[in-house]
């Protein structure tokens, strides 16, 4: 029987049921792991390494070859938990995606997610077959598994170097879109029997993507409409409802034989750009769930690895990773982005920024569950590849961005985090915001905000003291503002507040607008 065998006594040939004492021990271990993982984020942020490596290391240390000595080999459980975690991670990523930023990058990102994946799979699989001796089915699985990129890993090392919107938008949209076709390819290659003809496979991929996209957009729009028109009795219910709607999108897409991963990403993106009530609270809740999902998933994947078995697979992993990084990824980027006249500097950065993260290691469990011959070797190769090339690419990304002179827009003012609470019976909204340290709203008088008729600043909280402001009250950094707006002018009031936060009191004349909602 697979699973974690931690010296648990058995009764009548079966594992004994979980007791309260076992639960207490489990909660203690899980909470300690979470605390260690949270503390490790500080180390990873200073070193420039994506945090996924730290979490994987924690899992390996807890495993049978580490200090924990836990034997865990349940690939099916890992796959199920990994899928659930990936749904949460994609939902959090979609909620934080600004439509205005990725809209110009959609054609290029779509090309990378479809044509780019095909090129990457073909080149990498060919190299894996001829250079490492893998059978064609195994080589195709490896090529498909490692073709998925992880923008979260990229942004974790580039967060201190703001990039042009096109680069960030392309990387973010690509990572959200390419998971779906890659999952379909891995499942198809891992299925028993001959692989479908390429045109049949392409047709199935396009059909599943279309179903997933349609359901995701529909569920997201309906969910956003409902949350904007129904006043829930407690603010804490809004984040729960948003995440539940995102999971509904995934489940509906998967059960309809579409791409559930694309559905959850698009549904979350629709809701993330709909100016929902209590948005900062929702983003904070989703961000916390995303961290928990990442920590749990990577620790579990680390547990599944058996380090003493990796020795024979290190060289093949390095060879495949070298071809992927130096040939397949750059070729995909050049073929897909050159028609869109993307400058070579941006192409170079996006070629190097194809970091692999959670998805490849999760997808490597699919052939293990399917009983594909050599599946354990596939998992080991993918694991080594992800770890080694993340160690190489992660710390060098900021250096490359500076060398290519792409670290610009660093002095842009921070957006305001505006939280909106509906006042259903009064047919209005209460907007709450805090002026960030670098906001250009600092030094602006209340009357210089020029809010639309029907909106007014009713209260200012400064250093723990609240007062009703006068028209001549000067706003300062750290002030919390409460703004009451009627339903018809709520959106206009939010846009004006964001515009002043970005451009100061002359925002309207200088062309600064507030159309993009806060993340």
Residue positions per predicted region:
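Cytosolic Rossmann-like ligand/nucleotide-binding regulatory domains
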Residues: 442-488, 493
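Transmembrane helical cores of multi-pass secondary ion antiporters/exchangers
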Residues: 2-412, 423-425
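Short, solvent-exposed amphipathic alpha-helical segments in soluble enzyme
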Residues: 340, 367-368, 405, 449-451, ...
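A structural micro-motif recognizing beta-strand termini
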Residues: 433-440
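Soluble N-terminal domains of membrane-associated systems
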Residues: 483, 488-496, 505, 511-512, ...
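Short, intrinsically disordered terminal tails adjacent to the first/last structured region
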Residues: 1-16, 504-519
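Active-site proximal loops enriched in glycine and acidic residues that flank catalytic Cys/His/Asp
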Residues: 363-365, 389, 437, 461, ...
């Amino acid at each position: 029987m697979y699973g974690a065998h931690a010296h648990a006594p058995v009764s009548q040939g079966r594992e004994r049921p979980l007791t309260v004492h076992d639960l207490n021990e489990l909660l203690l271990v899980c909470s300690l792991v979470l605390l260690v993982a949270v503390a490790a984020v500080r180390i990873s942020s200073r070193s420039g390494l994506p945090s996924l490596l730290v979490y994987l290391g924690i899992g390996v240390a807890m495993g049978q070859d580490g200090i924990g000595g836990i034997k865990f080999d349940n690939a099916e459980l890992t796959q199920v938990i990994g899928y659930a975690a990936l749904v949460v991670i994609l939902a959090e990523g979609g909620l934080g995606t600004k439509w205005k930023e990725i809209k110009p990058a959609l054609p290029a990102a779509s090309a990378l997610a479809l044509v780019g994946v095909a090129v990457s799979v073909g080149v990498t699989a060919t190299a894996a077959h001829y250079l490492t001796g893998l059978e064609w089915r195994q080589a195709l699985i490896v090529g498909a598994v490692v073709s998925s990129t992880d923008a979260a890993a990229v942004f974790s090392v580039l967060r201190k170097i703001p990039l042009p919107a096109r680069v960030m938008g392309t990387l973010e949209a690509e990572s959200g879109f390419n998971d779906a076709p890659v999952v379909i390819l891995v499942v198809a290659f891992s299925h028993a029997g001959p692989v479908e003809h390429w045109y049949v496979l392409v047709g199935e991929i396009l059909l599943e993507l279309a179903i997933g996209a349609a359901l995701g957009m529909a569920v997201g729009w309906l969910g956003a409409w409902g949350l904007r028109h129904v006043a829930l009795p407690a603010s804490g219910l809004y984040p729960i409802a948003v995440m539940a709607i995102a999971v509904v999108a995934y489940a509906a897409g998967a059960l309809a034989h579409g791409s559930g991963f694309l559905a959850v990403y698009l549904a979350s993106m629709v809701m993330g750009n709909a100016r929902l009530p209590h948005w900062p609270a929702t983003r904070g809740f989703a961000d916390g769930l995303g961290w928990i999902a990442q920590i749990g998933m990577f620790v579990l994947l680390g547990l599944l690895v058996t380090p003493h078995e990796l020795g024979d697979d290190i060289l093949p992993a390095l060879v495949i990773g070298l071809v992927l990084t130096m040939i397949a990824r750059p070729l995909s980027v050049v073929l897909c982005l050159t028609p869109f006249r993307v400058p070579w500097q941006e192409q170079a950065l996006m070629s190097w920024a194809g970091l692999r993260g959670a998805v490849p290691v999760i997808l490597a469990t699919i052939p293990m569950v399917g009983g594909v011959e050599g599946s354990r070797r596939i998992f080991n190769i993918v694991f080594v590849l992800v770890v080694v090339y993340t160690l190489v690419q992660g710390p060098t990304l900021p250096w490359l961005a500076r060398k290519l002179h792409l670290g610009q827009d660093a002095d842009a003012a921070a957006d305001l985090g505006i939280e909106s609470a509906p006042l259903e019976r009064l047919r209005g909204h209460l907007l709450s915001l805090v002026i960030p340290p670098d906001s250009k709203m600092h030094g602006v008088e209340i009357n210089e905000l020029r809010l639309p008729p029907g909106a007014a600043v009713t209260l200012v909280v400064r250093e723990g003291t609240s007062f009703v402001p006068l028209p001549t009250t000067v706003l300062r950094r750290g002030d919390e503002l409460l703004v009451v707006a009627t339903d018809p002018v709520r959106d206009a009031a939010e846009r004006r507040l964001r515009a002043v936060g970005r451009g100061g009191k002359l925002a309207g004349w200088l062309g600064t607008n507030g159309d993009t909602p806060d993340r």
